[in-house]
Amino acid sequence: MANHHDHDKPLRSALDPISSPYFSSLNGTLSIAKEVLIGPFQGDHRRSESARILSDLAPSLMQPRFLNAASSSQQSLSKSSHPGAPYPLLRLPTNLPFNKSSRPTASSLAILEAVDNLASLSLGDVSHPQNGQNSPSLIRGFKATIPSSELAKQRRRMVRGGIVDEDLGGKIGLKKLGDRARGLLTEKGEDEEDGELGVGRHAVKKRRKKRESRRFTEGRHLEGKLRLEDLAKQADEIGQDKENLHVRQSLIQSEIAEVGAKIDALEDIRRHLEASLLHLQEEDLELDDELEGVQELMASPAIKAAAGAKSLPLSSSGAGISNKSSRRRKGPAFLPSEHDELPSGVAFMTLNGHTAPITALDFDEPYGMLVTAGQDDVVKVWDLCDGEEIGQLRGHRGTVKALQVEDTLCLTGGADGNVRLWDLRMVEDYEERLHTQLAELARQDPLERIAEQRAHEEDGEHAEQDDELPDGTLQDPQPGDGSPCVRTLEGHSKSVTSLYYEDGCLVTGSSDKTIRQWDVATGQCVLTMDILWAISNPPPPPSSVPPQRPPRLSHRSSTSFGSNTYEDILPSPGASLVGMSGAALLGAATGQNFAVPTPPYADGTWEMYQDFVGGVQFWGYALASGSGDGGVRMWDMRTGQAHRTLIGHTAPVTCLQFDEQYIVTGSLDRTVRIWDLRMGSVSEVHKYEYPVTALQFDSRKVVACTGENGVEVYNRTTHAHSRLVVNGHTKPAEKMRFIDKYLVSGGRDGCAKVWAM
């Protein structure tokens, strides 16, 4: 075991045979270097895999022809840089001053300083870093998996089988027995089989004696048939086979880990591809909306007049689109180029002017004119380009709870039960005229003004005033006197809480529990629909009702927790959330004065909710309404009858919108429900922590005010939820309206926020 002793000797003693005869001769140096390099790998002790590889490869690489080729190649490469360096093949890496032309470097000096420490190290076995399991080398894995690695096992089995055959007196024909047991035909005849199987009486007695002999000896028949050297060799082979088995296990485990890593990588790739596919679906929907917007422009009279006699290709559904309400237009908004530079999800403009929560708002187009109404009984008109107030709409007595803006026409419904139509182009001039009148009144003697008022009263010329100027003087903005109010519609006996206008037709909902249809051109009410009559006379259920599955609970707000099933919210968010039972809610809905307490908002405030009709919208002859009893009714405007009632909300419905396939509703029961009009059932339920007060949707998203400071945005394609909060409201958002990527919201803090989505 001399080599084993050389394996553990210090590095200095191992380098001495190389450094001392370095200039003697090339052959002597090569032989000594070979002995030093290969000596540690020739011991009989167990060595690491890298040492085995070097031990296997070094004898082949150190042959004379390889050494001569390497020496000549190295000399040819180093002639230009080191012409005088002897034996460059074995030149030490420490840049020792064998070559006077080489200049010392910082690295070489550091190595020279550490020579004593490095030389004192022993030449131990090369150890692999432990990473849970040793990874076998390529050569070791090859040796463990080649077919020849199984030869030793087969040889041992053959040796043991030969001994047993000799002990049993020859083969006993087990293969034939197996074939016959399976019913297979053999090539030999029955006589030959009987002879081979030894069916004769003599053979049977002989095998019986052999079995008795083996039973009595208890395996001692192997003694003397295998030598110690053979047994030791078999033990070494078994150890080698076990090592090969461990190597194969390690290889399989490595492959399993690689397959797992590949599966994870593929899953990650799949997720990215699915996200890309969803993004493409959103782009497809956006292109559909853009195409419809282009077709709408092509159908407009101005474009047709400019085109002259040219016939433009229009779809069959393109006729009449130009007159539809802005709430159903799907085309892209014409936004300035600077809008794309705004960060998304940030409120970039704040409009302060109301001293109470905002109750309604609407605008005609992005960066156009905005109209807001608040509980301070003020209706303001804003310029969205610079955020300046243009003026006010004076005329309603009380709070305006519903309004809509279509181009330059604005319709407002107030607590006085009236609906007023305004021309927004006249607001600025009217404001200037009012300021002029105020200046004249300020210069007039107060006694003269009082005398004039008494004279008007005595003559009966003084009429009931509808608004009050800042100095306390009443001003009556009647149509035709230069006021922006162009028409007043009277008919409701209580507050107008919702309205919808399209193509000269207006539908209003009121707390008097009726829905009225108006002809705006004549100012006449053409149809009245009684909700109480619809409640007491519900439409008959359809003859065949398809089985309804529970709707999928798609979302809980950020503060929600618990079950994600529908059953856990079905009984709970009903009227109990507003402090009333179902019977009490029905009683409030059918009573004379409707009023229920709202659930607390995020800031802890609450109020009495008195808007019996929370939302209305029509399309053609189809009308949808949401009322205080939690019902969503579909009306036929030709007959004035409700032909379907969607039951699901368990608190008053505050807002709704519908298109060709879906109707989306929000309620005080803290849910937003998406109904499938074809099935007449709920397809999705989105539950929040606070009451839903406003919503709007298009083909890609649903935007809602859910009683929190932020505005909730639900992506209908990716089913992802986000919230607009940056530079947002300081109190819960109450109302909102968006067109394309431009959104305006109004909150209980009395301010309006303009967002880039």
Curated annotation (Swiss-Prot):
WD repeats lie at residues 353-394, 396-432, 491-528, 602-645, 648-685, 687-724, 728-757. Residues 454-463 have a biased composition (Basic and acidic residues). It is found in: Mitochondrion outer membrane. Residues 225-300 form a coiled coil. Residues 69-88, 312-336, 454-489, 538-564 are annotated as: Disordered. One of its GO terms (cellular component) is transferase complex. It is a peripheral membrane protein. Residues 538-550 have a biased composition (Pro residues). SMART domains: WD40 (SM00320). Residues 71-81, 312-324 have a biased composition (Low complexity). Keywords: Coiled coil, Membrane, Mitochondrion, Mitochondrion outer membrane, Repeat, WD repeat. Belongs to the WD repeat MDV1/CAF4 family. Involved in mitochondrial fission. Acts as an adapter protein required to form mitochondrial fission complexes. Formation of these complexes is required to promote constriction and fission of the mitochondrial compartment at a late step in mitochondrial division. PANTHER family: WD REPEAT DOMAIN 5B, WD40 REPEAT PROTEIN. This is Mitochondrial division protein 1. It comes from Cryptococcus neoformans var. neoformans serotype D (strain JEC21 / ATCC MYA-565).
